[in-house]
């Protein structure tokens, strides 16, 4: 099933990977935000990732992973998956965004 949607998430992650724990990002013409917070779960460091675009949609991508980059990647994947399922992002928009980072 992945294909273009996985590529879209990865293109977005490439852009966010250079950024630190939180910030703003333009995605398909919308102001979006991401945040990564460290936490301890079962005596191990984990990172909670969140990606959201409040001026565009109420969808929020979330993930908890053992690395900061993993938390960003999986919260973005979660957002893209929800946005695709709700019809918020078209395949054409995804391809246009991806082409900027190839």
From Swiss-Prot:
Record-linked Gene3D superfamilies: 3.30.160.320
Entry keyword Disulfide bond: yes
Disulfide-bonded cysteines: 32-53
GO biological processes: defense response to bacterium
One Pfam family cited in the UniProt record for this chain: Anti-LPS-SCYG
Keywords, alphabetical: Antibiotic, Antimicrobial, Disulfide bond
Chain segments annotated as transmembrane: none
Top-level taxon in the UniProt lineage: Eukaryota
Biological function: Binds tightly to LPS and thus specifically inhibits the LPS-mediated activation of the hemolymph coagulation. It has a strong antibacterial effect especially on the growth of Gram-negative bacteria.
Name of the protein described by the UniProt record: Anti-lipopolysaccharide factor
């Amino acid at each position: 099933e992945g294909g273009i949607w996985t590529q879209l998430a990865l293109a977005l992650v490439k852009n966010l990977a250079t950024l630190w724990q939180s910030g703003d990002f333009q995605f398909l013409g919308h102001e979006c935000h991401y945040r990564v917070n460290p936490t301890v779960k079962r005596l191990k460091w984990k990172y909670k990732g969140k990606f959201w675009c409040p001026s565009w949609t109420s969808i929020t991508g979330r993930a908890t992973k053992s690395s900061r980059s993993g938390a960003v990647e999986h919260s973005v994947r979660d957002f893209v998956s929800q946005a695709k399922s709700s019809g918020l992002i078209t395949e054409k928009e995804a391809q246009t965004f991806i082409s900027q980072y190839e």
